[in-house]
Structures are given as structure tokens and as C-alpha cells.
Amino acid sequence: MSLVRTVTIVLFIIAFLQNAAAQKRQQSIVKSRGAVATDDGRCSVIGMRVLREGGNAIDASVAAALCLGVVSPASSGIGGGAFTVVKIAGGKEIAYDSRETAPLRATENMYGGNVDLKKKGALSVGVPGEVAGLFTAWKQHGKLPWKRLVTPAEKLAEGFKISKYLYMQMNATRSDILADKGLSDLFVSNGELKKPGTICHNPKLALTLKLIGEYGPKAFYNGTVGVNLARDIKKSGGIITLKDLQSYRVKIKEPLSADILGYRVLGMPPPSSGGAAMMLVLNILSQYGIPSGVSGPLGVHRLIEALKHAFAVRMNLGDPDFTDVTKVVSDMLSPKFAKDLKSKINDQKTFDPKYYGGMWNQIDDHGTSHLSIIDRERNAVSMTSTINGYFGALMLSPSTGIVLNNEMDDFSIPMKSNGNLDVPPPAPANFIRPGKRPLSSMSPTIVLKDGKVKAAVGASGGANIIAGTTEVYLNHFFLKMDPLSSVLAPRIYHQLIPNRASYENWTTVFNDHFEIPKATRVVLEKKGHVLSPIAGGTIAQFIVQESGENSGGRSELVAVSDPRKGGFPSGY
């Protein structure tokens, strides 16, 4: 047997085994009518059932998001907020900003320079927006009854199995869970954390969701739930009041938009920095020639450099109701601005942060969940929701069962200089004001081709979301990888400060291993990059509409859930 034939057979066997493994784990599915990709397969199925009953993508997003808040409470929930980009088939493109806000009694100097106070505890909690955001989008576009969409999460709250990934998050915050009565009542038994597969009961949250299902957001913002929530926060030393909840408003905006290599990319406007930063990176890289200019170790170097430029610019962004960000956003979407930045990229070496022109220090947001949905009519939803860090403020409201966010940690705060000239000052555009929304990295994205939905993509993973979402996009639309391979490819991250590239090198709780190849790392180090392995990163959810050449011309939806968190998509 010839060597060529032997190699061909071996490659075929490897490809077959990889495909069989993927099918067995259901990381990727192909469906024609509708598809839902979330961090947790239970929530993907709940969303799919909504679609099968005649609901649309917006309906499914409500049910799936509420589900995620129950079974993945370390990442998101009704105690947090969300950014949602929607494309209505043949119609509007809308961005729903249901980001948490600073309480009315919040001040720029409320933490006195004590960063721990804004990281956890009652003073770290922002006014939650998720319930209002879900209801507002549903009110405008939903088809099924609101109660029908809330009920599955209510039933799950009565009893759900702890996943391996949730257990990992519990382990990472063990001491804080034990220190909070609400969290320990939920996740601790006989002094030990409950194990994966254990049934977890949150009857208070089930009742809260029942009230929200019956009465809508007024139960949360101006009813029994709100009164109890405000009381619990006050008891713990917080400053959120019922008036804060009553004052909360969802902001409906136009998505950011950029035409890149024949596709139209829709993203979230400020206070998200994700949409503008991702478009800037794509505009820079698109000028190198596709795919050769972004391939191999040199392509990775160029990606890192583009990210460093984008992170330098993004800290000039903030809540547009408090800071004029018009020119900054215009620059970040401008191909000319991208061309100017590309000219500063040196293919032979990297530079220290000052070279990239950033004036301000970075914020390091955390956590989140992401879901992507495309329905039968080809309406699309891309939603990233969050309570910020693992279990948010590391406190659970005992009377409502709600895990509260620590979104105030995403604000910059004035700090005394420590004399380190390598660390720039905090960004004034992101300082605290009453009613202001903090800067975010969340990057829910919808891709259009000739005015029709081509893809919905996004990721969870805090400040790394920008790089993670961009890399999945690059892999598919620039490097022509299939959707599953685009998600499975190992990722690398850079946030400008600290000046190091973090690369995946870890084995997940599901025994998948992700690692940037050593050959790539060697090339990057020769160019001056400081590399640091990380056990984690981002979790992507990706749905692509394909032409459907194998299904009689009817378009197909290829949906992929990232195996890094163990989720799987569902569709029909």
C-alpha cells in the first residue's frame, strides 16, 4: 500500500471518528425550521419547544434566557441585565439595552478607592434590567403568551440538576457561598457543596417567576418581588431602593452596523464596547487579504495587534446618555481609521501598551451567558446576559431566590496614583453616576448577507468576549472553516493591559482539551509577545444559515454550542 493511500485512509478514519464524536455529543446540528444554541442544552430544548409551538425567535429567547438564569445561576439571571440584537425577517434591526444601572444614591467616590466593595456584597449591585428587557422585546415582537414563556423556568426552579460546569463555578467560589446564607441554603448540604447531578431546589425563585409570569415586569419592579428584593438589599447594606426599580427603563436603539467583505455585521452600541471593538478588529484584518493575510502564526500576531489597538480605543466609550461617544464610535466603525491603525502594526514585533495610544486603564468584566436563535421565518436573536462575576455579588436574596449581580464592578473609579507609570489612570467616561450604565464587553452579533440573516453569534467570558466572538467570526467568514470547527478552534486573548496574550491550554470538566499549538507560540514569543496559559476563556454560541444545497434548495441552519461549557443546541 502506498504511503499516500495510507495517509489518506488514516485521515479519513480520524475525520470519521471526530465527526462521530461530535454527533454523539450533539455539539452541532443541522435543522431547516429553527435552531437555538445556548450554554446549557436544557435551555436550548426549552427554546426549541417554543419554536415548535409557533413561537418566534423572540419568544424562544425569553424562555431560554429565563432557563439559563435558573440552571446557570453563576453566570446570568433575573438579578442581572442583558444586551440583545434582533433582526426581524424583512424588517427592522433593533438593539435592546437592558444593562444594569447605578442606583440613584450612587456616587463617583462611593467606594473610597476600596475595590473590594465594588466587587462583591450589597454595594456592588446594580439595578437589574433583564426582566424588563425580555418583556419589552416580547411585547413588540412576541407571539406566544408571556406566561407560557416563563413557566418552564419556574418549573426548573422547583428542582434542577447541578451541571458539571456549575459545580466548577461553585468550587471556585466555595468560601463565598458558605459565607452567604442565601447561597449556602441553595448549594450546600451538610457543610459541603452539592455535587454534580444533585437536585437543587429554589422554591423562592420559583414563586418569583410565577409572579412574573402572572403579572409581568410590574411584579419585579413595582410589586411584591421588588419590595422584597429592595428590603433584602437594604438589610445587607446596599443602597438600591424600590424607587430605583420603579425608575428602570429599557433603552431601544439601532444596532451598530458595518459592511465587511460582503457581509453586514450588526452589533450592540454603547454602553457595550463589544460591537464597535469587534468591527474595528475586523476592519483592520480585512485589509490583509483573505484568507492568507490572517492565516497561521502571522495571522494570530496580526489579530493580537488589532485587539490591542481596539482595547486602547474602547476605554473612551461609556454610557452615551452621560458621555458623548459619537466621534469615538464613528472612528471605530471607519475603514479609514482601521487603515491608519493597520499601518502601525509591525509584522516583526509587538510593543508596550503606550505605543497603541490608550490613555486609560482597562476594566475587567466577567462571566455572562450567551444565546443565539434563528427561527422558521428567519428572525434572529443574539443575546448576552450577565450578573458579571461568578454568582455576581456573591449574595442571594433570601425572600426572592434571586442571585444578585455585581455590575457596579464594571465602572471605573477614581484611584490615587501608585507611582507606576506603566498603569494608566481609570477612564472618566466610565465613572459612576446615578442612573448610569457601566461599560461592557458583551458582543451579541448578527450577520446579514444581501439583507437576510446569515448568522447569529456571540460568547460569554467577560472582557475576553470581544476576542472570542471575533475569532469565531474570523474562523468562519475569513478562514472558511465550517461552523463547528470555527467554535472548536483554540483561542487567544489580549486586553492591552496587562501586556500579555492569554492562550487556551486547558482540559474542560467534560475532558475536551484546547491549546494554541506550540509552533504558533514560539513564533509569537520571537515577536516579543508575553504568553500566559489560561484554563478557561470564552463560550460561543453560533448559528449559520447555509444555502441548503443538500435539502432541495431550502436553507438549513447549522447550530453549534461550545463544548467548553457542555451545552448543546436544539432545533427542528
Swiss-Prot record:
Induction notes from the record: By glutathione.
Tissue distribution of the protein: Expressed in embryo, roots and leaves. In mature plants, expression is restricted to vascular tissues of roots, leaves, flowers and siliques.
GO MF annotations, alphabetized: glutathione gamma-glutamylcysteinyltransferase activity; glutathione hydrolase activity; leukotriene C4 gamma-glutamyl transferase activity
Key words of the record: Acyltransferase, Apoplast, Glycoprotein, Hydrolase, Secreted, Signal, Transferase
Family matches, as SUPFAM superfamilies: N-terminal nucleophile aminohydrolases (Ntn hydrolases) (SSF56235)
Segments of this protein annotated with the region Disordered: 552-572
EC id: 3.4.19.13, 2.3.2.2
Residues noted as binding L-glutamate in the record, renumbered to the chain: R99, T386, N388, E407, D410, S440, S441, G461, G462
Gene Ontology CC annotations of this record: apoplast; plasmodesma
Entry annotation: catalytic residues: T368 (nucleophile)
Compartment list: Secreted, Extracellular space, Apoplast
Glycosylation sites: N171, N222, N505
Gene3D superfamilies on file: 1.10.246.130, 3.60.20.40
Annotated knockout phenotype: Slight reduction in size, early flowering and increased chlorosis in older leaves. Accumulation of GSSG in the apoplastic space.
Annotated PANTHER family: GAMMA GLUTAMYL TRANSPEPTIDASE, GLUTATHIONE HYDROLASE 1-RELATED
Family recorded in the similarity comment: Belongs to the gamma-glutamyltransferase family.
Primary role: May play a role in preventing oxidative stress by metabolizing extracellular oxidized glutathione (GSSG).
Protein's UniProt name: Glutathione hydrolase 1
Organism phylogeny: Eukaryota, Viridiplantae, Streptophyta, Embryophyta, Tracheophyta
Gene name as annotated: GGT1
